[in-house]
């Protein structure tokens, strides 16, 4: 079964337009009092396809690019995000499907599709989305940008003076960089690099009339949009090059010319168990990746048949791999337009707030270690400042003479690399410093190699992870000598140690000197840097040893509680079949299951007898939702009393039924509910115990569930619908307001961190 559950023996739950979590009445098919069928009895149609679910997420991003309520340059940003995301999808997910197809793998996906069926479905869905993106650009953004004084114009529409101006730019800045490559018996078909923009040019010898093919690569280091003198008009670089092809092919007749772009398989084929030197092996594999198999060919819609056939043949593709485009190729290059200094076309600038307990007095910085000795601090970025919290934690540790050791995992770090600088400074000061640099962080491999070498040169002990696993945990450990002995200070987060993404990714982190968390991190780093096995943890939940069984145990506890059970989870992805089935069983037992899944989701909610009590939401807004929160059980009265949104009539805080104890367990961490996170990565999940900090998490969850501005709801048929309500709740805007309100309160007794 691969279709809608309604095609089979299972009918959708009735009346699901009501409040999320409303269950069926006693005796209805989904009632916990009716005979219950095991989830497996619903067949493969109980799962949604992972690849199509990712494309659904891309569609939600695309909706924001078309939303007239979104500021104009923010719409351009979302279109650029969609385009770059689509590139990665083809480089990794489609490439993986094609590899499986070529290998003759016959196994089906969780939703029952063969590889061929998935490839056909992906092509159909992707074609529609890419076509919509083109229309948004051509019919929406271009005319609206022109109205705002930013004109994207074609070369053919320019007057003589403008063309002369561009000719000067071409001769001075563009022509010296170009390299035309001919194709003939003495010049084989050139290698076309991944995601490069190219011109396919047909030239003819005027004397013989013989036609030849040539390729001109559009230089990636030059601006994609060439600005005319007044900077108000922009012309595509490839159009400027095409208008001056006679300079590249003098004495030849210029025939057809078309823009094309190739996408290649970009996944690393690396067996780290066989590699003697992982860094060298990754470098070799990165060079090989340049020559990955082509998986997609984008061409302009007017391309001549002969030219297209040549490209398809030489790139070893099929017609199914060709995508004809009516808009400019590579809309990801809109980032250069997004950066224009036009504040009125952007969202109002957001300056992250310093958490009150971390705010110093005047020029005197706060003593972070003294703050943490009082109690834990919870930070949520970008609402709370990353620079004055997490960066300051590592920087202060590097400078503090009483700090003996610093250990940190680095998965993706930023270009300015403040963490790399701080760790190097600490090592040069004689501290014991260890860094796990994950060389297999996709698309950041080369950057991480550079950081690893810099750290090694500074005297940092650098390791590259555990064989067979990717280290995805976001953890830092500081060991400090104090009057009463050695104390360990820790940070466990949901997001990378990256100053750039911390401004646009929503993430959480806890700063603590809890002895159990410190001991667990000590064991974890010994495992990462040495040969020790991870021992039983005291506070943290670590993957791969404990994450899967822990999730199933926690879900099982709420399942056993029946209608008194409650599960609320916020993650980026939910695709693991075993976890999905466990959540189905919780729903069948009567537990309330509230899921916030930003991206891919294989669970099908609101199906009678299977998932009546499950709701799935996705919030897609200005900031990329990236935090992972796990809450099991009902919040206590003390937690609810501490919620900043407790008196907000638009935000519903559900109190536990009278017959139910209030014992919610709260956790944050790096792991999603996907097989790779559960089984093939090192992840760290930390408990949050303080009622004040749990209230902060409760606010995040409640606002996400109440959002009727940037939220989507998943239906039983697998379609996502934009939530449109009359309350006007934007969870992200409200969290900004709460951060400002917290920063204005300075008395420690009022602060939760």
Residue ranges of predicted features:
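Hydrophobic alpha/beta core scaffold segments
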Residues: 592-596
């Amino acid at each position: 079964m691969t279709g809608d559950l309604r095609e089979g023996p299972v009918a959708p739950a009735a009346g699901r337009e009501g409040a999320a979590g409303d269950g069926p009445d006693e005796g209805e098919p989904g009632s916990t009092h009716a005979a219950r069928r095991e989830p497996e009895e619903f067949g493969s149609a109980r799962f949604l396809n992972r690849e199509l679910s990712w494309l659904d997420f891309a569609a939600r991003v695309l909706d924001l690019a078309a939303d007239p309520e979104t500021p104009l340059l923010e719409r351009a940003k979302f279109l650029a995000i969609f385009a770059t995301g689509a590139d990665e999808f083809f480089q990794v997910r489609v490439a993986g499907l094609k590899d499986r197809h070529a290998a003759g793998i016959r196994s089906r996906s969780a939703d029952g599709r063969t590889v061929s069926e998935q490839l056909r479905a992906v092509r159909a869905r992707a074609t529609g989305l890419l076509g919509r993106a083109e229309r948004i650009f051509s019919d929406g953004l271009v005319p609206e940008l022109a109205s705002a004084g930013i004109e994207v114009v074609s070369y053919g529409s320019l007057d003589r003076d403008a063309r002369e101006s561009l000719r000067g730019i071409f001769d001075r800045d563009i022509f010296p960089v170009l390299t035309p490559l001919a194709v003939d018996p003495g010049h084989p078909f050139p290698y076309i690099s991944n995601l490069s923009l190219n011109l396919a040019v047909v030239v003819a010898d005027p004397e013989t009339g013989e036609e030849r093919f040539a390729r001109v690569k559009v230089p990636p280091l030059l601006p994609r949009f060439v600005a005319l003198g007044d900077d108000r008009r922009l012309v595509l670089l490839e159009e400027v090059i095409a208008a001056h092809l006679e300079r590249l092919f003098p004495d030849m007749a210029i025939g057809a010319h078309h823009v094309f772009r190739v996408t290649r398989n970009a996944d690393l084929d690396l067996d780290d168990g066989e590699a003697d030197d992982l860094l060298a092996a990754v470098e070799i594999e990165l060079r090989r990746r340049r020559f990955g198999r082509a998986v997609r060919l984008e061409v302009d819609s007017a391309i001549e048949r002969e030219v297209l056939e040549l490209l398809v043949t030489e790139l070893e593709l099929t017609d199914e791999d060709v995508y004809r485009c009516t808009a400019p190729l590579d809309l990801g290059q809109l980032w250069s337009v997004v950066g224009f200094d036009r504040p009125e076309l952007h969202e109002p600038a957001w300056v992250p707030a310093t958490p009150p307990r971390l705010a110093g007095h005047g020029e005197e910085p706060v003593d972070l270690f003294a703050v943490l000795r009082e109690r834990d601090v919870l930070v949520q970025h970008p609402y709370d400042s990353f620079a004055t919290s997490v960066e300051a934690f590592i920087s202060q540790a590097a400078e503090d003479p009483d700090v003996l050791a610093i250990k940190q995992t680095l998965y993706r770090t930023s270009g300015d690399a403040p963490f790399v600088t701080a760790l190097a400074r600490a090592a040069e000061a004689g501290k014991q410093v260890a860094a796990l640099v994950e060389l297999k962080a996709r698309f950041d491999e080369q950057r991480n190699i550079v950081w690893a070498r810099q750290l090694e040169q500074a005297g940092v002990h650098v390791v590259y992870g555990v064989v067979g696993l990717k280290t995805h945990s976001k953890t830092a450990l500081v060991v400090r000598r104090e009057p009463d002995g050695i104390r360990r200070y820790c940070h466990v987060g949901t997001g990378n140690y990256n100053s750039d993404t911390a401004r646009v990714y929503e993430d959480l982190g806890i700063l603590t000197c809890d002895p159990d968390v410190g001991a667990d991190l000590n064991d974890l780093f010994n495992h990462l840097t040495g040969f020790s096995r991870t021992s039983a943890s005291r506070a943290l939940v670590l993957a791969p040893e404990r994450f899967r069984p822990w999730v199933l145990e926690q879900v099982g506890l709420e399942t056993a509680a029946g209608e008194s059970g409650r599960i609320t989870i916020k993650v980026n992805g939910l695709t693991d079949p075993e976890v999905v089935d466990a959540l189905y069983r919780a729903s069948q037992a009567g537990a309330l299951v509230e899921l916030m899944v930003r991206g891919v989701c294989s669970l099908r909610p609101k199906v009678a007898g299977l998932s009546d009590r499950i709701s799935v939401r996705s919030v897609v807004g200005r900031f990329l939702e990236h935090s992972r929160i796990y809450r099991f059980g009902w919040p206590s009265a003390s937690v609810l009393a501490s919620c900043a949104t407790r008196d907000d009539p638009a935000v519903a805080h559900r109190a536990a039924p009278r017959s139910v104890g209030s014992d919610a367990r709260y956790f944050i961490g790096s792991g999603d509910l996907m097989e790779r996170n559960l089984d093939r990565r090192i992840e760290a999940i930390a408990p949050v115990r303080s009622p004040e900090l749990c209230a902060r998490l409760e606010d995040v969850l409640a606002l996400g569930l109440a959002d009727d501005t940037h939220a989507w709801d998943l239906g039983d048929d697998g379609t996502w619908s934009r939530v449109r309500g009359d309350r006007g709740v934007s969870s992200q805007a409200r969290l900004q307001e709460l951060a400002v309100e917290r920063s204005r309160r300075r008395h420690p007794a009022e602060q939760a961190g």
